[in-house]
Amino acid sequence: MLLMNLFTIINNDVPTPYNMYFQDSTTPHQEGILELHDNIMFYMLTVLGLVSWMMIIIIKDYKNNPITYKYIKHGQMIEIIWTILPAIILLMIAFPSFILLYLCDEVISPAMTIKVIGLQWYWKYEYSDFINDNGETIEYESYMIPEELLEEGQLRMLDTDTSIVIPVDTHVRFIVTATDVIHDFAVPSLGIKIDTTPGRLSQVSTLIQREGIFYGQCSELCGAQHSAMPIKIETVKLPTFLTWLNEQ
């Protein structure tokens, strides 16, 4: 048992103090975002290293002999290099980013739809595909739990009294809007960040590939209690989701 515990994977699905990297991904979208970030960082560090090396060489040579390049006015070859090379690097960055941008905006045959409504300062969720025993759409509101009411293990400024419950490995579409001001529905582990605009319906899809609890927050300054709009998503197995659905 101890050996099994040593090899247990503990995913980072919540913000942690002094964390310098992303939360662990749980969707293909976030995997693509992480890969694009790492690729761009590679190009940035390569350019930084190359330019720094050139600057050091130039400063060193000039220090040894200030008049070495006194009469050099231009260099055609170096001008060609510093024009073409950055263009190639930008193209290598642009093409993957355009592809990822297109894929993140594409909504592919969702199995279920959840409507998200942002209000000052809480969220409202509607499961438009399901109705309860009274023939009404399943909907509820989600408020942040005040710090003085938090139980052991709950997270300050992140835990809510209700959460979005989603079956794992299911294509889910979020349709988002707002009733008052612009909010932003953002969950880092899912790679989701989309504005909720009054009078406008926007959509984003996701496929969560593992069970867990994922947190997000409103990421658009929306008023005095902007920080009191956390998002909590629970991903469960399909039988557990159906049981939860029957209880609503």
From Swiss-Prot:
GO CC terms: mitochondrial inner membrane; respiratory chain complex IV
The keyword Transmembrane is assigned to this record: yes
Post-translational modification comment from the UniProt entry: The signal sequence of COX2 is processed by IMP1.
Transmembrane segments: 40-61, 80-104
Membrane topology type: Multi-pass membrane protein
Domain of life: Eukaryota
Record's keyword terms, sorted: Copper, Electron transport, Magnesium, Membrane, Metal-binding, Mitochondrion, Mitochondrion inner membrane, Respiratory chain, Signal, Translocase, Transmembrane, Transmembrane helix, Transport
Binding residue positions for Cu cation A2: C218, E220, C222, H226
Binding site for Cu cation A1: H183, C218, C222, M229
Compartment(s) of residence: Mitochondrion inner membrane
SUPFAM superfamilies with a match to the protein in the record: Cupredoxins, Cytochrome c oxidase subunit II-like, transmembrane region
InterPro entries: CcO_II (IPR045187), CcO_II-like_C (IPR002429), CcO_II_C (IPR034210), Copper_CuA (IPR001505), Cupredoxin (IPR008972), Cyt_c_oxidase_su2 (IPR014222), Cyt_c_oxidase_su2_TM_dom (IPR011759), Cyt_c_oxidase_su2_TM_sf (IPR036257)
Stated family: Belongs to the cytochrome c oxidase subunit 2 family.
Quaternary structure, from the entry: Component of the cytochrome c oxidase (complex IV, CIV), a multisubunit enzyme composed of a catalytic core of 3 subunits and several supernumerary subunits. The complex exists as a monomer or a dimer and forms supercomplexes (SCs) in the inner mitochondrial membrane with ubiquinol-cytochrome c oxidoreductase (cytochrome b-c1 complex, complex III, CIII).
Protein name: Cytochrome c oxidase subunit 2
Species the sequence originates in: Eremothecium gossypii (strain ATCC 10895 / CBS 109.51 / FGSC 9923 / NRRL Y-1056) (Yeast)
